[in-house]
Amino acid sequence: MRSHLVKPGSVYDGIEPGELGETTESVQDRVRQLESRNSFLEEQCSQIESEKRYLENQKIKYEREIRKLQSELDRMKTSPLIIGTVIDVIKNDRIIVRSSNGPQFLVNVSQYIDEKKLLPGAKVALNQHTLAIAEVIPSTEEPFVAAMEVIESVEVDYDQIGGLDEQIQELQEAVELPLTSPERFARIGIEPPKGVLLYGLPGTGKTLLAKAVAHRTNATFIRVVGSELVQKYIGDGSKLVREIFEMARKKAPSIIFIDELDSIAARRLNETTGADREVQRTLMQLLAEMDGFDKRKNIRIIAATNRPDVLDPAILRPGRFDRLVHVPMPGIEARGKILKIHCEKMTLAEDIDFKKLAKATEGMSGADLKAIATEAGMFAVRRDKELVEMEEFLEAVEKVSMAADTQKMMPSNLPETMFV
């Protein structure tokens, strides 16, 4: 029986009611499947788009890396430039330069270079083929020279130096006052000393005095050991001397301290080897730099040596080292002061007699007295004591005395012709 709802001739004509319900459910199920499939495809499409963007970013990154590596490769393939020095500046962008090989050339200048930087003495880079000036090399301090400048404050003051009051006064007058109160010298009408030479036996406090000057002054303090100026290749020692004094001029007021001066300023002899001639070149450069000072330059020189007898007479004349300060071995009162200074931070017993210790240390230097204080403390540590007593100091005096006697005996027992 046909349903009264189905019109004759319609699309549902001839379909039973049960069959019509099944068809609707299958269509709805198919729609749900298609919607689910569509959602899945949309998610896949979104994921693919995300991967596409990531790959495009990676492509840009790798292309940038390729360009960077290609640029580095091209730079590595570029011909090196020759280092030269400007000798003279001529009109019409023409410069006379000396190459690193020695000969001089008249060359052109790139239009992109500031002509104000092209001064005689300036370092420039030259094209390998045309020798045209490609760039001006900025002046830099030699790292070896820059390391000689004392940056950190030295914790040594004059009150920590015993028995050298006269030497401290002479050092203050010759080094500190010209830098801190130059008007005093101008008022009297004299030029302050340009250099001070400290000489004396080892361990008497020469380097300690220089450290105290570094602590008391706000000037740039440049410390040089004489042996550092002795270089392997010809001209390197003279170059170091020039650069040290150039740094002192740039950072004035400044103090140059040359320790172990005898290593480069020994007396010049007629018979010399190649190494001796190089040391003499360094000495002559040092003499020239010291003569180049004038009263307008706030630069002072302190030197120390324990062999004044071997120094060249040229370096001892007035105008170079105007003041020679002898640092003697400490006397009995000075030894007592030095021992008290070195024992300030030590935990001492009440029976310590510094006068007795000063008498027992006859002929000892300040360095020996410091060693005595250290050894006395070591004896107390060994015995697990709370205080350092007189007993430890007497044992320390005996130990340091034996070491000093052994050291004195060693060179005297060697034959004079041993190293000939």
UniProtKB/Swiss-Prot annotation:
The keyword ATP-binding applies. Its main location: cytoplasm. ATP binds at residues 203-208, 342. SUPFAM superfamilies: P-loop containing nucleoside triphosphate hydrolases. One of its GO terms (molecular function) is ATP binding. InterPro entries: 26S_Proteasome_ATPase (IPR050221), AAA+_ATPase (IPR003593), AAA_lid_3 (IPR041569), ATPase_AAA_core (IPR003959), ATPase_AAA_CS (IPR003960), NA-bd_OB-fold (IPR012340), Nucleotidase_PAN (IPR023501), P-loop_NTPase (IPR027417). Keywords: ATP-binding, Chaperone, Coiled coil, Cytoplasm, Nucleotide-binding, Proteasome. Signal peptide: none annotated. ATPase which is responsible for recognizing, binding, unfolding and translocation of substrate proteins into the archaeal 20S proteasome core particle. Is essential for opening the gate of the 20S proteasome via an interaction with its C-terminus, thereby allowing substrate entry and access to the site of proteolysis. Thus, the C-termini of the proteasomal ATPase function like a 'key in a lock' to induce gate opening and therefore regulate proteolysis. Consists of three main regions, an N-terminal coiled-coil domain that may assist in substrate recognition, an interdomain involved in PAN hexamerization, and a C-terminal ATPase domain of the AAA type. Belongs to the AAA ATPase family. This is Proteasome-activating nucleotidase. It comes from Methanosarcina mazei (strain ATCC BAA-159 / DSM 3647 / Goe1 / Go1 / JCM 11833 / OCM 88) (Methanosarcina frisia).
